[in-house]
């Protein structure tokens, strides 16, 4: 089965509701520079030698909660994407390192037949959601929108193009139900 092109996927309209912003955390990492079974090992150099330990800081977002919606005229495409998230062939990760999502990246009741904004506004909010949440929507009209140079054009060559986004604030419920229950319906914009 052939998957959609980057251009087809770029044609989808995306919206993100940020229920919890989370916090930025740092993970200090090292690679190589040690010994295993008495033999030195590490990151190989072109001449066959070894680099000393490579140290780096990796930044990631912890304890955040987002609801992402996609909209398209092609319902079959949305169903294929939804099915791919529900039954992935490879392990899913967030970012360039294997940061695995703590919950499945799809909702069992997430494939809905509504416009994008009402669907994002009307879906129950996550536990501990902020009282007011940010909603980021892709726009085709640059008027009143902010440019972003992160629209994938070519994954192989890591080329990106411009897209436009609009940010709105959405007020929601101020009291949450305990015990992992979902919150009440939010106010719509």
What is each model feature region?
Residues 5-10:
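Short, glycine-/polar-rich solvent-exposed loops and beta-turns at beta-strand/coil boundaries
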